[in-house]
């Protein structure tokens, strides 16, 4: 019986690049919507403070870490998880600074998933 190990079924079968991409999008949708509360969405914005302390860097890092975990599960790659962490934090930081619109933010995230799926699918 096959079992999952880091995004690849271990029974002689592997996922196609499109299947990896689909799992990456599912992970993104789950991490960016039901797993991101309204409080997290506000608290990860640059400049957010709580009781006089700037907590936004740690909240943004936690949010990016959840996304990195989803990438690790979908691809089995720690390298891609690390790249996702950096990219996701950078994209969300840019959005928080007003450099990206909502649609631009989501397009950048999906673009990263295309790159990760391509890398994982051909590695």
Q: Which role does the model predict for each range below?
A:
Residues 2-22, 68-80, 115-123:
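Helix-coil boundary and interhelical linker segments in multi-pass alpha-helical membrane proteins
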Residues 23-67, 85, 89-121:
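Interhelical loop and helix-boundary elements at the membrane-water interface
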């Amino acid at each position: 019986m096959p079992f999952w190990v880091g995004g690849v079924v271990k029974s002689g079968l592997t996922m196609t690049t499109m299947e990896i991409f689909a799992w990456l999008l599912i992970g993104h949708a789950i991490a960016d919507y039901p797993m991101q509360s309204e409080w997290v969405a506000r608290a990860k914005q640059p400049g957010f403070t709580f009781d006089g302390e700037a907590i936004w860097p740690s909240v943004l890092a936690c949010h990016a870490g959840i996304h990195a975990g989803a990438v690790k599960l979908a691809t089995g790659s720690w390298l891609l998880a690390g790249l996702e962490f950096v990219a996701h934090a950078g994209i969300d930081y840019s959005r928080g600074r007003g450099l990206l619109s909502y649609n631009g933010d989501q397009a950048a995230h999906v673009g990263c998933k295309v790159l990760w799926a391509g890398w994982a699918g051909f590695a």
